[in-house]
């Protein structure tokens, strides 16, 4: 059964497999009406590709060019406090154009070791979200239901989010039946040496994976959760969607988070 979600199809056509953003549902191949100013104060986009002034001018009009700078020839520095004109469409164009040659595949990491760094300032949030994965699969109106059921049976069910440098964070994944819920730990890069990442058996029915950072470290993000599948595409869940409509039986994802001060999202 082929996944016909327009977002998944567009990503596959471009060679992408996963895109992660903080706090918003901006997608790099789609244009949204809202701006990204509520999520970002400043953006620094870094790549192995060498940006040029001509490239900058091709992306931005002169009226917002004053907000754009180069960082030692290695990236683009966008100070959103200097412009009111940077929309999600511009952000989409940055990502699609800037990395189309240097990174043909995007799966929480660029395969050619390029990196994208979104610097974020003044993030203060405390969040405790619970996503149980039950009712969604029982919705007969959802045409992707069987795809996800099959992926769960095959063990290709993963949960991933953005990466966030924060003062403190704890995430806990539980599953009743061993093998149902997987966390793709291999995609997490640059973990602090003293970060805790362990799997625990609680009694005879629960398998628990706990990820906890030290006082500061690169950890999972909290505002955007993406469920993705190795073969059949991507399902995106964010704050604008109904968290009570969920995937799977006897499965739950619990995020216990405490994020303070400024940080940055890093995909490496």
Swiss-Prot record:
Modifications after synthesis and translation: Palmitoylation helps stabilize the inactive state; may self-palmitoylate. Palmitoylation is not required for permeabilization of liposomes by the ring-like pores in vitro. Palmitoylation plays a significant role in pore formation.
Highest taxon of source: Bacteria
Region listing for C-terminal region, in residue ranges: 248-268
GO cellular component entries: cytoplasm; plasma membrane
UniProt keyword terms in alphabetical order: Antiviral defense, Cell inner membrane, Cell membrane, Cytoplasm, Lipoprotein, Membrane, Palmitate, Transmembrane, Transmembrane beta strand
Record annotation: effect of changing residue 247 to A: No longer cleaved by protease, non-toxic, liposomes incubated with bGSDM do not leak
Outcome reported for the amino acid change (mutating residue 245 to A): Reduced cleavage, still toxic
Site features described as Cleavage, chain residue numbers: 247-248
Transmembrane segments: 78-94, 103-121, 168-185, 195-211
Lipid anchor positions (S-palmitoyl cysteine): 3
GO biological process: defense response to virus
Entry note about domains: The N-terminus has marked structural similarity to the mammalian gasdermin N-terminal domain. The C-terminal region wraps around the twisted beta sheet core, probably stabilizing the inactive state. The C-terminal region can assume multiple conformations. The beta-stranded transmembrane 'fingers' of the active protein form by local refolding of several alpha helices found only in the inactive state. Reorientation of the N-terminus probably flips the palmitoyl moiety for insertion into the membrane.
Similarity section: Belongs to the bacterial gasdermin family.
Name the record gives this protein: Gasdermin bGSDM
Organism of this sequence: Runella zeae (strain ATCC BAA-293 / DSM 19591 / LMG 21438 / NS12)
């Amino acid at each position: 059964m082929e996944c016909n979600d327009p977002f998944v199809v567009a990503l596959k056509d471009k060679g992408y497999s996963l895109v992660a953003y903080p706090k918003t549902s901006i997608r790099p191949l789609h244009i949204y009406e809202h701006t990204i100013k509520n999520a970002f104060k400043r953006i620094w986009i870094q790549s192995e590709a060498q940006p040029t002034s001509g490239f900058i001018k091709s992306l931005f009009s002169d009226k917002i060019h004053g907000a754009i700078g180069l960082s030692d020839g290695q990236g683009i520095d966008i100070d959103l406090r200097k412009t009111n004109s940077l929309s999600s469409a511009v952000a989409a164009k940055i990502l699609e154009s800037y990395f189309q040659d240097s990174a043909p595949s995007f799966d929480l990491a660029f395969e050619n070791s390029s990196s994208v760094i979104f610097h974020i300032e003044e993030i203060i949030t405390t969040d405790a979200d619970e996503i149980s994965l039950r009712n969604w699969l029982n919705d007969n109106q959802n045409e992707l239901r069987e795809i996800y059921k099959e992926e769960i049976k095959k063990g290709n069910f993963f949960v991933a989010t953005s990466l966030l440098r924060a003062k403190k964070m704890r995430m806990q994944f539980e599953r009743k039946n061993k093998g149902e819920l997987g966390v793709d730990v291999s995609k997490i890069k640059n973990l602090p040496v003293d970060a805790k990442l362990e799997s625990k058996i609680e009694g005879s029915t629960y398998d628990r994976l706990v990820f906890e950072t030290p006082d500061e470290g690169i950890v999972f993000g909290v505002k955007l959760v993406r469920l993705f599948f190795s073969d059949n595409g991507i399902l995106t869940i964010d704050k604008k969607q109904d968290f009570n409509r969920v995937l799977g039986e006897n499965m739950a994802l619990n995020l216990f988070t405490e994020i303070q001060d400024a940080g940055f999202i890093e995909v490496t």
